[in-house]
Amino acid sequence: MSAEVPTFKLVLVGDGGTGKTTFVKRHLTGEFEKKYIATIGVEVHPLAFHTNFGEIKFDVWDTAGQEKFGGLRDGYYINAQCGIIMFDVTSRITYKNVPNWHRDLVRVCENIPIVLCGNKVDVKERKVKAKTITFHRKKNLQYYDISAKSNYNFEKPFLWLARKLAGNPQLEFVASPALAPPEVQVDEQLMQQYQQEMEQATALPLPDEDDADL
């Protein structure tokens, strides 16, 4: 008998149009093996990753666009063990709504590890700059710039979550999953610049603002 693969429910949330479905579909096996749960209108993609401690799997719950019609039902969040909140760096309103998604998620799942992802960093007209991305620091989340269409930083959120869930900072991915070929290319120099800007921004004190709505 082969050992059971540790499997974790991951909820993927954020405004409609931020690239959540594009992101999850990059992982080809997960896309091939996805299942549709009609009762709550969700697609579940089983994303497997190979680590130096064996295989780990995330059952990624994708909302299939329901968030466009208001909030998601609690049934979507129940028993989630980790989460990714996504916004679009070309759309300020999607970042402004991040606290609402975070509130809904932690109301049902209190102390789960969560990664905040700013998607579409391949687009030149970036609106949400590093210095304005502070929510993750207030709430102790991890943050990554990503570009779903180019696969840039695709594995980063999953690796961070895997380490948290396994309680092992030494965990590494030893083989890359098969990903859909990039539809766009990122500018490597620009990505390095963004990373430096993020590091510099993280070193700054958090702005004094009214946290009542965050």
Curated annotation (Swiss-Prot):
* Annotated GO CC locations: cytoplasm; fungal biofilm matrix; nucleus
Q: Where is this region: Switch-II?
A: 65-81
Task: Provide the residue positions that the database annotates as binding GTP.
Answer: 15-22, 65, 119-122, 147-149
Q: Where is the Small GTPase Ran-type domain?
A: 4-168
Pfam families annotated for this entry? Ras
Q: What is its main location?
A: nucleus
List where in the cell it is found. Nucleus
The Gene Ontology biological process annotation of the record reads:
protein import into nucleus; ribosomal subunit export from nucleus
Organism domain of life: Eukaryota
Which residues lie within the region annotated Switch-I?
A: 34-42
Keywords noted in UniProt: GTP-binding, Nucleotide-binding, Nucleus, Protein transport, Transport
Provide the GO MF annotations for this entry.
Answer: GTP binding; GTPase activity
Instruction: Read off the InterPro entries from this record.
Output: P-loop_NTPase (IPR027417), Ran_GTPase (IPR002041), Small_GTP-bd (IPR005225), Small_GTPase (IPR001806)
The UniProt entry's sequence similarity note says:
Belongs to the small GTPase superfamily. Ran family.
Its assembly, as annotated, is: Found in a nuclear export complex with RanGTP, exportin and pre-miRNA.
**Function in brief:** GTP-binding protein involved in nucleocytoplasmic transport. Required for the import of protein into the nucleus and also for RNA export. Involved in chromatin condensation and control of cell cycle.
Q: Which PANTHER family match?
A: GTP-BINDING NUCLEAR PROTEIN RAN, RAN GTPASE
Q: What is this protein called?
A: GTP-binding nuclear protein GSP1/Ran
Q: Name the source organism.
A: Candida glabrata (strain ATCC 2001 / BCRC 20586 / JCM 3761 / NBRC 0622 / NRRL Y-65 / CBS 138)
Its gene is: GSP1
